[in-house]
Amino acid sequence: MLTIADVEFESRLFTGTGKFSNSQVMLEAITASKSQLVTVAMKRIDFKMGLDDLLTPLRQAGVRLLPNTSGARNAKEAVFAAELAREMLGTHWIKLEIHPDPKYLMPDAIETLEAARILCEKGFIVMPYVHADPVLCRRLEEVGCAAVMPLASPIGSNQGLVTESFLKIIIEQARVPVVIDAGIGAPSQAARAMELGADAVLVNTAIASSASPIVMAECFKEAVQCGRRAFEAGLGRVQTGAVHTSPLTGFLNQ
């Protein structure tokens, strides 16, 4: 069981709501994934037009919403988006995203740390999306973040665990849950993230852009479960050379 703040999650697969062909496919894929925490961008919600098309189906599915501040270019804009989410959606959970560069969507470490400090002081449950920087993740812990969400590779790239070496350090040092976010493009990559000891993964593009999102969601669900079980069972140590599994010459003496 995974615990973030005071909430327990049976599923360690978190999902998103973007890039699906329509809301029905989105809902069926999320249901198939068994995800219990689903992120939604505040910039996608038109509060003047009502919440039915996107949010009502998610609430009916019983998932917890994790609004995100995607589109914010600095700490001020991110704090505004978080406060709007709390007011309009009734949640103090927030996925903090600040990426002013529209090409690569790399998170701004300085603005993210400042926004995290402000939001934690305001009573938010903050889960920041950041580069795989062990020092930054420690600083975010210190200001009160409930979890950290280091990227595996650029958002939507499906490149996999490009930052694996740094993710290992973050997982080793973290005192809060580590959710690997962004760039996971295949179930095998999600399984690998879990084998490293990540507490959860967040997957959106790889599911939504699949030719069969519902089947792909099921695949990710199973991969995350297997990866976590493998981590808990204990993976064998990687050796630099061959190690025989049985005596090589004993039978010659019989």
From Swiss-Prot:
Residues binding 1-deoxy-D-xylulose 5-phosphate are G156, A182, G183, N204, T205
GO CC, one annotated term: cytoplasm
Fetch the InterPro entries from UniProt: Aldolase_TIM, Thiazole_synthase_ThiG, ThiG
Which CDD domains does its entry note? Answer: ThiG
What Gene3D superfamilies does this protein's entry cite? Aldolase class I
Q: Which residues form a coiled coil?
A: none
Indicate yes or no for the key word Nucleotide-binding: no
E.C. number(s) listed in UniProt: 2.8.1.10
Catalytic activity of the protein: [ThiS sulfur-carrier protein]-C-terminal-Gly-aminoethanethioate + 2-iminoacetate + 1-deoxy-D-xylulose 5-phosphate = [ThiS sulfur-carrier protein]-C-terminal Gly-Gly + 2-[(2R,5Z)-2-carboxy-4-methylthiazol-5(2H)-ylidene]ethyl phosphate + 2 H2O + H(+)
The answer on whether this UniProt entry bears the keyword Cytoplasm reads yes
**Group of enzyme by EC:** transferase
| Superkingdom of origin organism | Bacteria
Which GO terms of type biological process are on file?
thiamine diphosphate biosynthetic process
Places the protein is found: Cytoplasm
Concerning Pfam families, the annotation shows: ThiG
Name the major location. Answer: cytoplasm
- Main function: Catalyzes the rearrangement of 1-deoxy-D-xylulose 5-phosphate (DXP) to produce the thiazole phosphate moiety of thiamine. Sulfur is provided by the thiocarboxylate moiety of the carrier protein ThiS. In vitro, sulfur can be provided by H(2)S.
Q: Which family does it belong to?
A: Belongs to the ThiG family.
Record-given protein name = Thiazole synthase
- Species, as recorded: Shewanella baltica (strain OS155 / ATCC BAA-1091)
The organism that produces this protein has a lineage beginning with:
Bacteria, Pseudomonadati, Pseudomonadota, Gammaproteobacteria, Alteromonadales
